[in-house]
Regions:
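Outer-envelope beta-barrel architecture signal
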Residues: 34-40, 64, 74-76, 107-111, ...
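Outer-membrane beta-barrel "beta-signal"
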Residues: 145-148, 152, 289-302
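Transmembrane beta-strands of outer-membrane beta-barrel pores
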Residues: 44-50, 72-74, 82-86, 106-108, ...
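Outer-membrane pore/translocation modules
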Residues: 34, 99-202, 272
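Outer-membrane beta-barrel transmembrane domain signature
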Residues: 48, 62, 181-264
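Membrane-embedded beta-strand positions of outer-membrane beta-barrel proteins
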Residues: 40-42, 68, 76-80, 111-113, ...
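Bacterial Sec-dependent N-terminal signal peptides
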Residues: 1-32, 222-224, 297-301
Length: 302
């Protein structure tokens, strides 16, 4: 099932890459194109998923990833990352993680797609000055979703300059954002959680959000940019999902990036924060916090 979702999402993004590759007018006093036909990227992503439930914080053990990417000026992007080694922990837990994310930074539209499958979490507390871990090796969280965000002031604010380093933001600018998305979540408890969470459940959500983005041109070399959107999703567990039985779920997504740009290369430190809330059939709340940080070096090639 996970590979089918990944294949469908990949196909969807390839089609959209081709569709949005058609050039659109920009205010060249604010945004300019690079003259290069290609870029090559090397990046180090750190993808995380934290669960907040019943005053407890659940974390998996994470691997360290590295990645490479390639883009031609027609708009076709290819970014691939893979695990190189697990980060050391003293929990004696080895989490199973599939974390697939795709981000399309268009001239007017931002598209985010993700599929996450995490199995194996732990909690920790202090006891007699030492860390004590409680392991939940079969506690599983699966989720996938698709977000679309429209940039209203797209002639002066460039998503690509801020988050892809494939355009140049010449003057500071901001824009109102309008977005919507569809999301699926499934939570499978560990056997040790049967008293507090007796059975697995899934959850469907659909909603809309509004936000703002701003790029601050600190100097000709440095750019600081951020965007944040907040909204409300509506949905419920599949067994009770009906128009007359919808719940409201708060949702938020944010981005922050610091870029250093030269004529033919750049580096960026970027954070993406995608947070959702779900409820079990017994109305228990689960906060799903999914931050991603990434260090990227981009080389532009003529």
């Amino acid at each position: 099932m996970r590979y089918t979702i990944i294949q469908i999402t990949t196909f969807f993004f390839v089609i959209l890459n081709i569709t949005f590759a058609i050039a659109q007018d920009k205010d060249t006093l604010y945004v300019q194109e690079y003259p290069h036909k290609w870029w090559v990227k090397a990046f180090i992503p750190n993808k995380m998923l934290t669960i907040l439930h019943d005053k407890e914080i659940y974390n998996p053990t994470y691997p360290q990833n590295i990645g490479v990417g390639l883009r031609k000026i027609i708009g076709m992007n290819l970014l691939v990352s893979f695990s190189v080694f697990p980060l050391k922990t003293d929990t004696d837990l080895s989490s199973s993680i599939t974390d697939f994310q795709m981000h399309k930074y268009g001239k007017k539209l931002l598209l985010d797609g993700y599929y996450q499958d995490y199995r194996g979490f732990f909690t920790q507390r202090e006891q007699d000055g030492k860390k004590v871990y409680t392991l939940f090796p079969n506690f599983t969280v699966k989720r996938w979703g698709l977000d679309g965000t429209y940039v209203l002031r797209n002639k002066r604010f460039s998503l690509r300059a801020a988050f892809e380093q494939s355009e140049k933001q010449i003057k500071s600018a901001g824009s109102l954002l309008l977005g919507s998305g569809f999301y699926y979540h499934k939570i499978v408890p560990d056997a040790s959680q049967q008293q507090s969470l007796p059975k697995a459940f899934d959850n469907y959500q659909m909603g809309a959000n509004i936000g703002y983005a701003y790029s601050w041109v600190v100097s000709p070399r440095w750019l600081l940019a951020g965007m944040v959107s907040a909204g409300v999703n509506f949905g419920n567990n599949s067994e009770v999902l009906a128009w007359h039985n919808l719940r409201a779920y708060p949702a938020s997504i944010g981005r922050l990036t610091l870029n250093y740009n030269r004529e033919d290369w750049s580096f960026a430190l970027t954070g993406i924060f995608n947070n959702k809330t779900v409820y079990s059939p017994s109305a228990q709340s689960f906060e799903l916090l999914a931050p991603t940080t990434q260090f990227t070096i981009t080389r532009h090639i003529r």
